[in-house]
Amino acid sequence: MEEREGTNINNNITSSFGLKQQHEAAASDGGYSMDPPPRPENPNPFLVPPTTVPAAATVAAAVTENAATPFSLTMPTENTSAEQLKKKRGRPRKYNPDGTLVVTLSPMPISSSVPLTSEFPPRKRGRGRGKSNRWLKKSQMFQFDRSPVDTNLAGVGTADFVGANFTPHVLIVNAGEDVTMKIMTFSQQGSRAICILSANGPISNVTLRQSMTSGGTLTYEGRFEILSLTGSFMQNDSGGTRSRAGGMSVCLAGPDGRVFGGGLAGLFLAAGPVQVMVGTFIAGQEQSQLELAKERRLRFGAQPSSISFNISAEERKARFERLNKSVAIPAPTTSYTHVNTTNAVHSYYTNSVNHVKDPFSSIPVGGGGGGEVGEEEGEEDDDELEGEDEEFGGDSQSDNEIPS
């Protein structure tokens, strides 16, 4: 039993790496076996010297007590390297092939405690427009209106177009106030004329003038939305009294979508905040506007047109005749002879060769007396064709004959 156990221990010796080696005992007769020893699964790079049976048993027992757990190493394969070298296109996958979520690297947090290691080049400054900017050389198109006439107007920071004398304003009408009275009060603060551009907001009561009946009005009560509001008020000075002349027209929409409107003839109460856009201008300044426009053209370098209207009547007449001179088109030199005939179809089939030479010979022009002349000429042409056929040895055959 001891020898058998010693043999088993000698045959299966465990190394310090947890790997087993197998050895076969030599033949008792001292000869060599023909079969080679089996190749171990995991060959140990460290060779174990042969020992005696008691020493081998002692080593095996010590190694078995202090043996470490076996481990395995996973080496990268060629497929993995090929996949890494292969460039993937398109959007990266959100899930792995096994269904697990792909873990992506979180971006570096942006905070003051984390210093930036990468240095970015300074941003290049773009080329400026330079001193040759035409817009800077010219005067500004918009400027604040600081004329003494408009100091009383309730418009803060209003823009005045150069040469237009038009200033926009925004009026806010609170709930329960009359929009018409608000606009009239604003127009009486200055000497300028006003025009209503637009408005929006809810209306609770409105009185409209009916165009069908003279002097008739109609009042609507409810909640309506302003679609449009237009009108103007001009200042009139007559007999030392200053008054305003003008009117407004409105278009409203009801809660059911019905649209109606007309000229305002009474109350125009706001059901909520109403915003009104008005513009003020100086009326009767047509001549000054023309002068300002001329000055602006000269300032901007616009040259006036070179059209001159100081020309004499004779020169104007000569230009007209030169433009409206008639062009004489010469008549064509080719002339066609027309032959009167009463049987155009017969002449077309019997005189095919002559028809090719003169396409107008078979067109009837009119008159009944020319039939005999056409028949005689047709017979002469037939005689000429027969003579040509006999000369060239051909058989003459009429166009209206059916070949057998």
Curated annotation (Swiss-Prot):
Acidic residues bias locations: 373-393
Main location: nucleus
Keywords assigned by UniProt, alphabetized: DNA-binding, Nucleus, Transcription, Transcription regulation
Comp. bias (Basic residues): 123-133
Stretches the record annotates as Disordered: 1-51, 70-100, 113-133, 359-404
Listed Pfam families: PCC
UniProt-recorded Gene Ontology molecular function terms: minor groove of adenine-thymine-rich DNA binding
Protein's name according to its UniProt entry: AT-hook motif nuclear-localized protein 3
Protein source organism: Arabidopsis thaliana
Gene name of the record: AHL3
